[in-house]
Every structure is written in C-alpha cells, then in structure tokens.
C-alpha cells in the first residue's frame, strides 16, 4: 500500500532511483561494518573476487522498485545496532529498533518478523552466556543483569511494534501464512529454494556463502556467538527461499566478513 501510494505521487522512475540509492546506502553500511574503509585493513583479493563482488552484483541485479529493498536497509540497521550493542556494549541505540520496526511492518510486513527473530536470537545467546563461556572458537559473552534487562525490554518492544499496523496482531502470523500458500510457492520462483544445479546460482549465490562459512573455520580469532547465530539464521532462511538472499548478503558482510580480514573486533574498535 505504501509503495503504491508513493508510485502514484512520485512516479515509478523516481521510486526506482530511490531503491538504487537505498542499495548504495546499504552497501556503504555493510562495507563500513566489515572494516573495508579502515586504513591498512584491506580484504584479501580472493575474498573480494569470490565473495563480495558476486554477492553485491546479485543484490544490485535484484534492486528494483520493491519493498524488499527498503527492508534491506532495516536489516542492515539491525545488524549495525545489534553488533555495536553486543561487542561494544552500546545499549541506547537498541531503543531505536522498535521505531525501525514500526516503519518496517508498515512498509513490508511480510519480512517484519525478522525484527524479533534477530533481537530474540541475541537475547537467547545472551542467556546462554550465563551458563556457557566458550565452545572452541565460539565465544559467549557473560552478560550482566543490566544487559539482560536491556535486551529483554527491547525484544518486548520490538514484538509490540509489530502490532502497530492497520491489521494489528494478524501481521504477526501473516508471514507464516504466506509460507504455507502452496499456489504462491509453486508459481513465484523467488520463493523456491536455491537450486545448486543451476550454474549461476552455484557460482553467484552458493559458492560465496560457502566461502563465508570457510572464513569462520579459518580465522584464528574468537567468534562471537551472537554474530554466528544471526548468520546461520539467514542461511536457514536462504535455504528455505531465495528471496532472503539479499538479507543474507547484508548479514554476512556486516557480521562475518570482518573475520576474513583479521580485523580486531574487541570493544571500542568496531
């Protein structure tokens, strides 16, 4: 509804230009979080050629006047805010997440459930950190009561924010109803799972993902459990439907790519 209204006011040409601007903003946010703009912190050439360039090329090719690419900005914003909250203990920006969620659910309600997925996963990993310290290279930060309180409040607010829309509570179940629509799943190709037998899918989508996973395996650094859990959330979603590829690219670049560059991830240096 919002997109139709904007098209009627501005015309499709300006909406397409706006979506391309959103693409550039999201790429900037991703690359900044990955550390690409840091002095003397350049990614390995192979990572550029085999991961970042193919992924952002596919993302750019998908950039048209669709609400999914507004949602991409929201996913990037959640990555930036949650990463800084977890690694740098910056709590106050987390209270922007419910506000972002209100915009998200009213612009593209079909993906707004990602808001409470992301916050909920960070909350669960934080609780797990009370009982678990490290599992190999996977690091669980031991939370204090203040952090648990903040993340729980933000989670409740984000869930509540999903109710602020013309359809109320029904928007909480709408995405799941979509996923059960057999006709839509059969006739809309982007809802299908990625097909590794397709050469382009293999080279441009699956191979960069596998290299992202290899990044985690090869790094000598401790890997934050929350960042890893968010990455695997989007892997599962992508394997369920190719429509989540754009969001996987964003999450992989923001949260996992820094490990490929051997960038210091300690507090105050993100």
Residue ranges and their predicted role:
Residues 109-217:
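Transmembrane catalytic cores of multi-pass membrane glycosyltransferases
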Residues 62-70:
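Short acidic/glycine- and proline-prone juxtamembrane loop motifs at membrane-interface regions
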